[in-house]
Amino acid sequence: MLKLFKILVPVLLIASCGMKPSIEDDKLSDRKFSLEEFFDGETTAYGQFQDILGNVSRRFTVDITGSWDGSNLRLIEDFVYEDGSEEQRIWNLVKTSDNGWIGSADGVIGKAEGLTSGDM
């Protein structure tokens, strides 16, 4: 019995690693992801910068205030870094299709283009 347990547990652990949700898997929820709904209001996020080897060089918290007027999504991002420095970036996003967006912000060269996919 112990021998079977020693074989079965590692096999189940390995099998479970391959069954993680994917962004392409629309079956995780019945609600389609809506960028404008998600960011309309207050959101807090946490992040970090790291190099190619995974070494963290800087951490931050960002408070995001979003407002949606029916065609434009405005995001005011207030960053606070772990060293106490602060930065603000204001994004203006325009919905170009059912899941397409184009955005711009001061300090960003060119336009950002993106697509939404998946569920909430």
Report residues per predicted region.
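Extracellular beta-rich ligand/substrate-recognition surface
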Residues: 22-25
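Central antiparallel beta-sheet cores of small beta-barrel/beta-sandwich binding domains
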Residues: 46, 50-120
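Sec-dependent signal peptide recognition
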Residues: 2-10
